[in-house]
Amino acid sequence: MPFRSNNPLTRDELLSRFFPQFHPVTTFNSGLSGGSFLIEHQGQRFVVRQPHDPDAPQSAFLRQYRALSQLPACIAPKPHLYLRDWMVVDYLPGEVKTYLPDTNELAGLLYYLHQQPRFGWRITLLPLLELYWQQSDPARRTVGWLRRLKRLHKAREPRPLRLSPLHMDVHAGNLVHSASGLKLIDWEYAGDGDIALELAAVWVENTDQHRQLVNDYATRAKIYPAQLWRQVRRWFPWLLMLKAGWFEYRWRQTGDQQFIRLADDTWRQLLIKQ
C-alpha cells in the first residue's frame, strides 16, 4: 500500500497511525541494518525500513518498494506500506550467515530471479560513477581516478548478454537461509541489467568460488561457461570503480574510517588489475 505524505512521520507517529497494535522488538537485530527495526503483534512480524542513504532521491526508495511489490514471496519480503522515509515489509524468518551458501544453491536463486519480469528501469553505472566522483572529498580526487573514469566513459558499458531484473547487492549478509530456501533482502539497488553484471557483483571469497558460481549458473541458463565468464570479467573494471567511488562517497557522508580503508583497498585492487 503506497501512502503519500509531504511531511515525514516520526517512528511513533508511523506506528500509532498504521500499526497501533504492534510494538518494537528491541532485543532483535538479526539481518537488520541501517535504521531498520522489527515490530510484532501476536506472532506477526514486520520490518520497518528507512533509506540507507539519506541523500538519495526519494524515487530510489520508491523503486525499491515497486520492485518488492512485483517479486514473488519465495525470494523477497512482501511490502505492506510505503510512505516518505518509511517502508514496512514482511520479516523473513531464518538465519543470516557470515558466508555464502553452496554455489549451486546461490546460482539457482539468481537464475530464478533473472527469470522474473523486468522491473522497468535500467541500471546504468556511468551516472553513479560520476556522482560518486562529484560527491567525494575533493582532497581524495586523484588524477588516476579521473583518468579511469574518462577511460570507462569512452569505452561504454558492455553490451548485455541477457537483460533481467537484478538485485545487485548479493553478499552473505543479504541472504536469509529459511526453511523454504534462500531469500534476498535489501533490494535498494535493484533494477534491470545484464545477468553477468549481477554475477560479477556477488561478494565472493576468491576467484575459484566465483568461477564455480558462474559455471553453476551457466549450466542452468544453458550458456557456455567460458562465454559467461568472459562477460563477467568485462564488468570487473566497472564494479571496482563503483565500489571505490561508493566507499569514497560514504566516507565524505559519514566520516566513518572503515570506508577510507575499504576505498584504499579497492584502489589497490585496481592498480593490480590495470
UniProtKB/Swiss-Prot annotation:
It catalyses: thiamine + ATP = thiamine phosphate + ADP + H(+). It comes from the Bacteria. Keywords: ATP-binding, Kinase, Nucleotide-binding, Transferase. GO terms for molecular function: ATP binding; thiamine kinase activity. Gene3D superfamilies: 3.90.1200.10. The keyword Kinase applies. Pathway: Cofactor biosynthesis; thiamine diphosphate biosynthesis; thiamine phosphate from thiamine: step 1/1. It holds the Pfam family APH. Its EC number is 2.7.1.89. Disulfide bonds: none annotated. GO terms for biological process: thiamine diphosphate biosynthetic process; thiamine metabolic process. Catalyzes the ATP-dependent phosphorylation of thiamine to thiamine phosphate. Is involved in thiamine salvage. HAMAP family: Thiamine_kinase. Belongs to the thiamine kinase family. This is Thiamine kinase. The lineage of its organism: Bacteria, Pseudomonadati, Pseudomonadota, Gammaproteobacteria, Enterobacterales. The gene is thiK.
